[in-house]
Regions:
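Jelly-roll (double-stranded beta-helix
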Residues: 2-204
Length: 204
């Protein structure tokens, strides 16, 4: 993960992914920009990832990029929302922090409801193990399983680390308690190929 680093007080199974270190990359169709949070295997391009989590900024109406054999979960995190047409069927996305699933390779057109939006985008290869996406608030215990935690608004504390808005923490080991001061995404990741390598170079 570019920019990932272990927190100095933390065990090596935890990798901090600061929002400030992400680079904006234009969509392949030019309709917006994306900032990758994490992906596996490390260094995989858009044609080779097993899973990928990013924040996507949509500034204008138009089609979404198509990703063959990819499933996606989209969560609106900023803005009024979108009126989508997915494979000819209308889908209104106008409520923040509600994950919505749809195929990544079906023609999808977007009409903004009231200006630019930001979406949390989780994608994975069809036929592989699907990540889970939940938006939580308050205090809860996360089990010992791979997960990516992204503070969406209000910040969060876990594993001795304080997350600001859009900061993320990759967890690959022990139980931990999450204190989510505002909406916080928890992306459950199976031990898919590439996950161990994702944190290997970040460990002490």
């Amino acid at each position: 993960v570019a920019g990932g680093r272990p927190h100095p007080r933390d065990r090596p199974v935890t990798v901090l992914l600061p929002a400030a270190e992400r680079v904006a990359v234009a969509w392949k169709n030019g309709g917006g920009v994306t900032r990758e949070i994490a992906a596996a295997p490390p260094g995989a391009d858009m044609a080779a990832f097993a899973w990928r989590v990013s924040l996507a900024e949509v500034a204008a109406d138009g089609p979404f990029s198509a990703f063959p054999e990819v499933e996606r979960t989209l969560t609106l995190v900023e803005g009024a929302g979108m009126d989508l047409t997915v494979g000819g069927r209308r889908r209104l996305v106008d409520t923040r922090y509600v994950p919505q699933d749809f195929p990544g390779d079906v023609p999808t057109d977007c009409r903004l409801l009231g200006g630019p939006v930001v979406n949390l985008n989780v994608m994975w290869r069809r036929g592989g193990a699907a990540p889970t996406v939940a938006v939580v608030r308050g205090r809860l215990r996360l089990p010992a399983a791979p997960a990516l935690v992204v503070a969406l608004d209000g910040g969060a504390d876990l594993a001795g680390v304080r997350l600001g808005r859009y900061d993320a923490l990759l967890l690959t080991g022990e139980d931990t308690v999450l204190h989510a001061h505002g909406p916080t995404a928890v992306v459950g990741l199976t031990p898919a190929r590439g996950l161990a390598a994702l944190t290997h170079d970040e460990r002490h």
